[in-house]
């Protein structure tokens, strides 16, 4: 049904028809009403407990300009080659199909 309405050029009508069929509007209205009542309750609670707001701690300032874990990144020119040499003894031989590999 929505496709036929879109083909007629009435995109707004088609969207409205799809949303009405899916019953989106009534659900959204209920959620808006729920949110408004919750915000009223929280405002009343804030008036009753003004001390809890002043007790909240401020977040600690963080220094993101330096990396703290320096031993984790200890690279030099031969790091990859050293690791490659150390791990080469644990590598398994590659399976062979019996044919020679193509030369490019």
Curated annotation (Swiss-Prot):
One of its GO terms (biological process) is proton motive force-driven mitochondrial ATP synthesis. It is found in: Mitochondrion inner membrane. Residues 1-35 form a transit peptide. Residues 38-68 are annotated as: Disordered. The keyword Electron transport applies. Coiled coil: none annotated. One of its GO terms (cellular component) is mitochondrial inner membrane. It is a peripheral membrane protein. The keyword Membrane applies. Residues 38-50 have a biased composition (Basic and acidic residues). Keywords: Electron transport, Membrane, Mitochondrion, Mitochondrion inner membrane, Phosphoprotein, Respiratory chain, Transit peptide, Transport. The modification Phosphoserine is found at residue 101. Pfam families: NDUFV3. Belongs to the complex I NDUFV3 subunit family. Complex I is composed of 45 different subunits. This is a component of the flavoprotein-sulfur (FP) fragment of the enzyme. Accessory subunit of the mitochondrial membrane respiratory chain NADH dehydrogenase (Complex I), that is believed not to be involved in catalysis. Complex I functions in the transfer of electrons from NADH to the respiratory chain. The immediate electron acceptor for the enzyme is believed to be ubiquinone. May be the terminally assembled subunit of Complex I. This is NADH dehydrogenase [ubiquinone] flavoprotein 3, mitochondrial. It comes from Mus musculus.
